[in-house]
Amino acid sequence: HSTMRTRYFFAILLLVPVVYFNVKAQGLPDLGEASQSAFTPAMERQLGQSIMKEARADPSFYDDPEITDYVAGVGNRLAARGADTRQSFEFFMMRDTQINAFAMPGGKIGVHTGLITAAQSESEMAGVLGHEIAHVTQRHIARMVSNQQANQWVSLAAFAIALLAARSNSQVSQAAIAAGPALAVQQQLNYSRDFEREADRMGLQMLEKAGFDPRGMELFFERLQRATRLVEGGAPSYLRSHPLTYERIADMQGRAANLPYKQVADPIE
């Protein structure tokens, strides 16, 4: 079934913020050279193109040129100030009321319509986009893959099943999450807090350099945390895709406070 296959691929993409990788997050780390041999940029591009074919065939793919061009304009403005200006990006929309965005291999960035609705300023939306762009420029997917063992693709499939189950209430999904391989997945679905902090900090730099209000990131995080607090409190920790912690918000507040203040008029279009 096309829709199910697409969700399967999207579940894999959510691995970026949730798979554990033991990297040091003291300051702003360098691009991971170890990732180059395990999962090359060419492999990332090929995988990204394959997944995009599935995305475009999904009924929730939101083909609105005006909105897509607007989001792409903001995203490319940020990417031009990123860590890897050679990386090209493609931004696309998914019709989904959930507040979310996600990074895919090869510089593909998916944005839910719910994110656009929830953002109260252009800088808030840009803060989320900058975070996802940083996942790509810092090669988090490649660094995750390089940390897997010989059965890495089997592990990815198990992760996908577990995350797919999180988005469905079907008995089949519940059975999948209870299966032996998925139970092992639970132990690995610890948040990569280092990846998230890294993406926050790189995203904040892009936000400031591109002329947005750097406080947009922390303000949106705060609102998102308030909106999801009840859901997070009742969900198994291994099914949460982003660790929205007070620590992350405090870190962003501290870093933004040290940047020169500038007034930005940025109503979202």
Spans of features found by a protein language model:
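Extracytoplasmic and endomembrane cell-envelope/extracellular-matrix remodeling and assembly machinery
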Residues: 31-38, 61, 69, 182-269
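Hydrophobic or amphipathic, alpha-helical segments that drive membrane association/targeting
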Residues: 3-102, 184-185, 227-232
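Active-site-flanking alpha-helical
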Residues: 52, 114, 134-142, 251
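Membrane-active amphipathic alpha-helices enriched in small hydrophobic residues
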Residues: 153-168, 175-185
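Active-site recognition of the HExxH zinc-binding catalytic motif
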Residues: 111, 127-135, 139, 199
